[in-house]
């Protein structure tokens, strides 16, 4: 579960691994981040991950974002979880200039959600659309093999076609972080 507030150059946020417990943590995390301030005084726009990812986690995130936005007459902006994950890895210093990135999230059904892209100039540039596939069914969006596989879907790397990932570094513990997305 990850939340962030970016206001007037100040960033505060929380990022906690709470598998299957987002609904019990998200509002408490929001309250802690607001620190007693009214939502309307602290926020101009609400953004949330819109997938792909855990169906329940996405429902919680989108429901809370929509409910808060509706109650305060604020706009909502959605962002791709796979892009957020890649930006997080890059801003944590885990990606190198020119890395060919496969951002992957375990779909929990012997498949993964994936998105190809490149790390250039301090940003993740996507190459194609997000997809879901079995590890053995992975197709390259270009002729360039991955130099790094990030996210929980990296656990399938041994089953992915070797011509696409054989020399790729693996970072399975990277997850999207709202603090990074708030700064973008």
What label would you give each PLM region?
Residues 1-52:
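N-terminal beta-alpha supersecondary unit
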Residues 10-11, 15-21, 75-176:
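Surface "functional belts" at beta-alpha junctions
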Residues 23-24, 176-183:
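Short, charged, surface-exposed secondary-structure boundary motifs
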Residues 33-37, 71, 89, 181-184:
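Stable alpha-helical structural segments in soluble proteins, enriched in small hydrophobic residues
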Residues 43-49, 57, 100-104:
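Short glycine-aspartate micro-motif
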Residues 47-81:
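DPxDG-like acidic metal-binding loop motif
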């Amino acid at each position: 579960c990850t939340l962030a507030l970016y206001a007037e150059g100040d960033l505060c946020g929380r990022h906690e691994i709470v598998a299957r417990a987002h609904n019990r943590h998200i509002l408490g995390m929001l309250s802690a981040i607001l620190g007693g301030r009214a939502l309307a005084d602290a926020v101009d726009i609400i953004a949330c991950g819109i997938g792909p990812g855990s169906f329940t986690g996405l429902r919680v995130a989108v429901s809370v974002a929509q409910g808060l936005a509706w109650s305060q007459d604020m706009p909502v902006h959605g962002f791709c979880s796979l892009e957020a994950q890649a930006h997080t890895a890059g801003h944590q210093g885990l990606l190198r200039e020119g890395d060919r990135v496969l951002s992957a999230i375990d779909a929990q059904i012997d498949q993964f959600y994936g998105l190809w892209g490149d790390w250039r100039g301090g940003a993740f540039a996507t190459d194609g659309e997000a997809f879901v596939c079995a590890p053995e069914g992975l197709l390259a969006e270009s002729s360039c093999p991955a130099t790094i596989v990030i996210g929980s879907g990296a656990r399938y790397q041994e089953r992915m076609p070797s011509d696409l990932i054989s020399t790729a570094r693996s970072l399975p513990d990277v997850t999207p972080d709202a603090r990074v997305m708030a700064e973008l």
